[in-house]
Amino acid sequence: MIKRERYMQQIRPFIGNELIKVLTGIRRSGKSVMLELIKNELQEQGISNAQFITFNFESLANAKYCTATALYEELSTRIAGVSGKSFLFFDEIQEVKEWEKCINSARVDFDCDIYITGSNAKLLSGELATYLGGRYVEFVIYPFSFEEYLECKKQGQEGQLSIVAEFKDYIDLGGMPFLTNLHGDRRASMLYLRDVYSSVILKDVVKRNNIRDVDLLERIITYVLANVGHTFSARSISNYFKSENRKVAPETILNYIKACCDAYLFFKLSREDIAGKKILSVNEKYYIVDQGIREAVYDGNTRDMDQLLENIVCMELIRRGYTVTIGKSGEKEVDFVAQNGNEKIYVQVAYLLSSKDAVDREFGAYDAIRDNYPKYVVSLDDYDMSRDGIKHRNIRDFLLTDKWE
């Protein structure tokens, strides 16, 4: 188990205070392990095991507590036997009907510190905003970054890792934490990733949104997977189905894709007019949370290397807390405009800069951008081709850089 220090740095200031800590993210991204890491830190501070009260609602043992009233009654009983502050951990809380009422009552009635996890962005919408508005802080937990992937691979392994070889595996298998237990067994990894995908689709998309046409959903997902990092519209998908003699309204397509985004399977990036600093409402792009899932479900990661490298960089920017958009500057496009508070960077991603035309095209994306924020061109090339103040970085080095500036 690695420490996942980037997340712990975000969570640590809130440990022990009255705000409810909400950990969200796609299933199997490591939210339960984060709860264990938090417990470990509390134990190091002198908190006893008797002060921890834990519910995992994926376990049948806790099925009898899957209503707000039943859970609150059980909490009351357990907390009565605790000396001092209670530390409450609820894993996959969305399985509890009207859970927000129970959590809010616990916050008000008991001396406690509350941590919850869930696998859907809707966890923090609707009624929860009414019950807990301003009283919670959210942390999205993602699959392993390349840095975390390497950290995990180094555990229990003698000698130096080959960064180049490991990155090839990372492109293929992705960063779902459990894969480290499979020791690079590709067949087992693909089976596991397909199971994760099926679980997400069934529990967090179909069941949660009452989707009846599962075949249509999966065909839409396949279309999005094929077009990761490419511009498309709901109407273009609708026309695609029309060519196959199937009528599907663009609104239905948008609703299905949004349901997948709510389950943290896809992330939508809007287009930004850099000069006018306006968000445009057309030509969004979608990226998948983990490239290994794409390989398991769709296949072709090595065939679509330009798309996959772009996807990996996009998710790394999001993972580090940046708000990411696609940059439009005149007739040219910058892959990513990433902003985090006062920090801002531009990133252009390419597979290989194998010709002068390729170099001119990628660096030329910045021709009309006159500000002084850092600008990067990232590719698999090892030779540094930086020019005109624009930094060229090998993608492996870029992903392993602690701070971009």
Regions found by a protein language model. Name each.
Residues 31:
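Conserved lysine of the Walker
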Residues 54-84:
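Short glycine-rich substrate-engagement loop in P-loop NTPases that contacts/grips substrate
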Residues 327, 351-396:
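Catalytic cores of nucleic-acid endonucleases
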Residues 23:
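Hydrophobic anchor at the beta1->P-loop junction of P-loop NTPases
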Residues 2-16:
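Pre-Walker A adenine-sensing motif
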Residues 186-344:
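Accessory nucleic acid-recognition modules appended to NTPase machines
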Residues 34, 38:
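Hydrophobic positions on the alpha1 helix immediately C-terminal to the Walker A/P-loop
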Residues 121, 126-231, 264:
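Interdomain motor-coupling "hinge/lid" segment immediately C-terminal to the ATP-binding subdomain
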